[in-house]
Amino acid sequence: MSLSLLAGCGGQETEEAGEGGEGEGGGKITFMAPDWAIPTEDQLAAFTEETGIEVECSEVGWDDIREKIATAASANECAADVVEVDWSWVGEFYAADWLEPLEVSEEDKADMPTIETFTVDDQVLAMPYANDYRLSYYNTEQFAAAGITEEPQTWDDVLEACRALKETGTVEHPFAIALNAEEKTSTCLMWLAYTMNGVVWNEDGTFNEESVMEALTYLETLINEELVAPEDKTSSGMDAYMRICGGTASFLTGPTSFVSRIQDEELCSVVGQIVPIMTPGKDGKAQQTMPLPEAIGVSSLSENKEAAKTFVEWYTSADMQKQLNETNSAIPTRNSVLEELIDEGTIKNSGAMLEEAKIVSSPFPNGIPSYYAEMSSAMYNAINKMALGELNAEEAYAEMSEALNGLISEE
């Protein structure tokens, strides 16, 4: 097995990573992940002491991991025994047979709803370690200044609140959302349609026209009434999200990481004003929300599969999820651990964070497709054109739908 792609924690290549074969104790494995997923030296030492398995870490930029895995696999080589698996890569990795299926108990599946995202044809391909799902946030003081005393329950409530915020001069562009030509813009349309109607795609993989058109029309209204900021159309999605921390936006549906961001005085100028709430729906609060988690999986080309699986089990255990929250700021994917951290006050001002975690479910009826990246590109480009006034909602839908249907026909 070639490890030429690795620059491990020790900064050295090794030919020993393939030793300690199947079913044996001890040995050495390699782990490739972004910086935020790398365990501490003490944590790795504890794992080695417990199992006899040494772990060589390769800290790789998130954007480069997928390419490194693909490059190695094309030469029938293993980039690393255990690898980062983003939710959006699952379909591609499954189609290419790059991941070894994992055995997961029903108890763990119940405790980690985001496992569904990494499950294809009843096979669990990776175990989620970092929880991200869509949660809503609103600035209670700004809402009150505009005469709004109730928390928004529906998307219509949010729209009317944003109109009031603008009309009263409280906030000029109160709705923060990604509209640039990037991935976050695609997922914004996905979660909006999903929380509105519980569906984004039909069973055959095509868009559910009624649901997606309703979401696009909602976005078009926000754009036309200038309830979103002009800069949201061209700046990064994260910059758009961060407007709520700067006080230039009053409402956001975004990452769970904002539970911490809205309390950090170095990042947020309106600390104490923003509350995490259940995401709105069509007739009341949404019955489901979209997960966007990160996971780790075992390479199908690994020569150390059993040792690698042992590492995955350890890394995603309840105890390690607590440790990784402390050392790496990872939001637990186990609801039992999330609840414990909230109850003991480790995670503060959590609002509806735990309640929302319990309604996480995947919007993909047949799992994430292998053509996800191409589909997402078609989506965010069409939405961005709509934001810039080049397309209306109907035209944006037609462009997206035509591209998706073409991808499906090529399958």
Where are these regions (language model features)?
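Ligand-binding clamshell of periplasmic/extracellular solute-binding protein-like
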Residues: F31-W36, C57-E116, P128-Y137, E151-L159, ...
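Periplasmic solute-binding protein
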Residues: G91-W98, T114-E151, A178-N202, G284-K285, ...
